Amino acid sequence: MPSFDVVSEVDLMEVENAFNQARKEIAQRFDFKGTHTELERDKEQNVLIRAGSEGRAEAALQVLMEKLAKRGVALESLDPQKLEPASGGHVRQLVKLKRGLKIEDARKIVAKVKESGIKVQAAIQGEAVRVTGKKRDDLQAAIHAIRAAAFPIPLQFQNFRD
């Protein structure tokens, strides 16, 4: 039976490249000179923005988002947290990277597939949703229904098998 998987993944190499490009641009741009604005990454691939003011932190976030968009990373995978005051009158902002399909989102995808009335079955398998059907056309209709639902996370369709 034909099947495919619905997953939510982020290409970490592209995130790394965009992060490095944004860090270089912030270091070189005239409007960031002397503002102590910097980008850092942690073990979980989250980005920490440190800046001298809220405006510079927001501008650094915009630079990062611009570089990510140019590299093909979906901006829905970013989860910017609230600006926090830091020592020395600076501010910091953590930007988390959403990776993997949470159970609630997977359940919503399964419910959307079932309510669409297409003759396919959807099952949650870890951090993916496996959709199986008898015809390839049914699977393509299921993909269209999932895309039309406009979920707030980036979705990819993988392992399309006949």
Curated annotation (Swiss-Prot):
Q: Which UniProt keywords apply?
A: Nucleotide-binding
Q: Which domain of life is it from?
A: Bacteria
InterPro entries reported in the protein's UniProt record: DUF520 (IPR007551), UPF0234-like_C (IPR035571), UPF0234_N (IPR035570), YajQ-like_sf (IPR036183)
The question of whether Nucleotide-binding is a record keyword is answered with yes
One GO CC term, this protein: cytosol
The positions making up the signal sequence are none
Q: Which CDD domains match?
A: YajQ_like
Query: GO molecular function of the protein, one example?
Result: nucleotide binding
Gene3D superfamilies (UniProt xref): 3.30.70.860, YajQ-like, domain 2 (3.30.70.990)
One Pfam family of this protein, by short name? DUF520
The answer on whether this UniProt entry bears the keyword Nucleotide-binding reads yes
Family the entry assigns: Belongs to the YajQ family.
Question: What does the function comment of this entry state?
Answer: Nucleotide-binding protein.
Identification of the protein by name: Nucleotide-binding protein A2cp1_0112
Native source species:
Anaeromyxobacter dehalogenans (strain 2CP-1 / ATCC BAA-258)
